Amino acid sequence: DQIESGTYLVYDGACGTGGMLTVAEETLQRLAQERGTDVSIHLYGQEVNDKTYAICKADILLKGAGEAADNIKDDSTLSADGFPAHEFDFMLSNPPYGKSWKTDLDRMGGKTGMRDPRFVVHHADEPECSLITRSSDGQLLFLANKLSKMKRTTALGSRIAHVHNGSSLFTGDAGQGESNIRRWIIENDWLEAIVALPEN
């Protein structure tokens, strides 16, 4: 209901072949048309797998959006953020779950040496809280990356749709990265819904 005429930036930090980006663009265009608004949509994505990255980039080129293909980056979102100074209107992802991100962690200086501002938050007068999760599963870090790219000064703000398995709801003890990410979301009142899907 809040889609007004204007420019919207859509981001997927685990974009694969770009399918979710394409569906998001088509959905926004349809909603804008139904409301009689004129929108310009720019897609941004990052993919670590060279083959799926190439498919995504080629798909955007084939759609005739040559410059837009420059907005698809090839590297790990966790250790090599392709869009460090960007904020986005809409963000979505289906990141890998249960997949180790130890290589990224080592590349970033390890748990004690990492200084990436995407993965550290401050709560009131408390010392900084680390959002670094256990190295065996980095899915919540993809969400923390998106939270760091939210627009906070516009009326619409940002909207995030993120696909997870159930472990994101309960892993990590109090004070650990997973718990700190959930706390950050709840204390900022960013959560609108959790939708559980059936198996298969």
Predicted segment positions?
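Conserved S-adenosyl-L-methionine
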Residues: 1-93, 98-111, 165-167, 173-176, ...
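Short amphipathic alpha-helical segments, especially helix-boundary/capping motifs
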Residues: 29-36, 116-123, 155-160, 187-190
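Conserved Class I SAM-dependent methyltransferase catalytic core
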Residues: 57, 126-199
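Surface-exposed acidic, glycine/proline-enriched linker/cap segments
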Residues: 59, 113-132
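A general structural signal for short secondary-structure junctions and capping/turn motifs
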Residues: 79-85, 89-92, 96, 132-134, ...
